[in-house]
């Protein structure tokens, strides 16, 4: 994305932009963007996968390996002002095998006052929503809805996600 595209997005009514791949080429993009639109309007996504005992960062929809360890990337990101961090476990994404609580805890301990949203593997039959509500500010779900495991209405009623 470039600033012209971002300007068009915000002029069209958006209040937040989601950034991932671009940061691997220009991490200072966050500062440039924040100076114009404010940190609260930035949502940073980290796509990660466990590889040889460590979590590593990926980009381009989880297809490109960055060779950057997750913990190193989190340390760098803590120097920037953005409102939300989305962590995606790409090995669990679309698998419905449950969220990765170990990964959530690892990230939660290392981010400075950012809203944390998790994506990857949610299954309403096995995940304890009360634990997730304590650890997360948001949860991204898709396949469980697509496969009709539940509806958003049922999710809302059953789990009362509102904090």
Predicted features along the sequence, with ranges:
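Catalytic cores of alpha/beta
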Residues: 1-13, 102-141
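Short, small-residue-enriched loops and turns at beta-alpha junctions
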Residues: 2, 52, 92-97, 124-125, ...
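Conserved anion-binding
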Residues: 4-93
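General structural feature for long, well-ordered alpha-helical segments within catalytic domains
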Residues: 5, 29, 73, 99-103, ...
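Short, surface-exposed acidic/glycine-rich loop or hinge patches that mediate macromolecular interfaces
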Residues: 24, 121-123, 146
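Alpha-helix-loop-beta-strand connector modules within alpha/beta enzyme cores
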Residues: 29-48, 97-124
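C-terminal helical cap(s) of enzyme catalytic domains, especially alpha/beta-barrels
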Residues: 29-37, 129-163
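Charged helix-capping and loop-helix junction motifs
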Residues: 64-71, 97-106, 156-157
């Amino acid at each position: 994305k470039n600033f012209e595209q971002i300007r068009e997005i915000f002029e069209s009514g958006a209040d937040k932009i989601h950034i991932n791949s671009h940061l691997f080429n220009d991490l200072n993009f966050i500062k440039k963007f924040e100076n114009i639109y404010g940190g609260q309007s930035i949502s940073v996504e980290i796509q990660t996968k466990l590889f040889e005992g460590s979590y590593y960062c990926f980009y381009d929809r989880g297809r490109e390996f960055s060779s950057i360890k997750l913990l190193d990337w989190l340390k760098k990101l803590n120097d920037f002002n953005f409102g939300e961090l989305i962590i995606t476990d790409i090995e669990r994404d679309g698998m419905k095998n449950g969220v990765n609580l170990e990964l959530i805890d690892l990230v939660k301990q290392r981010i400075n006052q950012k809203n944390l949203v998790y994506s990857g593997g949610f299954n309403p039959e096995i995940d304890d929503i009360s634990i997730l509500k304590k650890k997360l500010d948001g949860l991204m779900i898709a396949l469980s809805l697509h496969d009709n495991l539940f509806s958003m209405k049922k999710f809302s009623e059953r789990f009362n996600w509102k904090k």
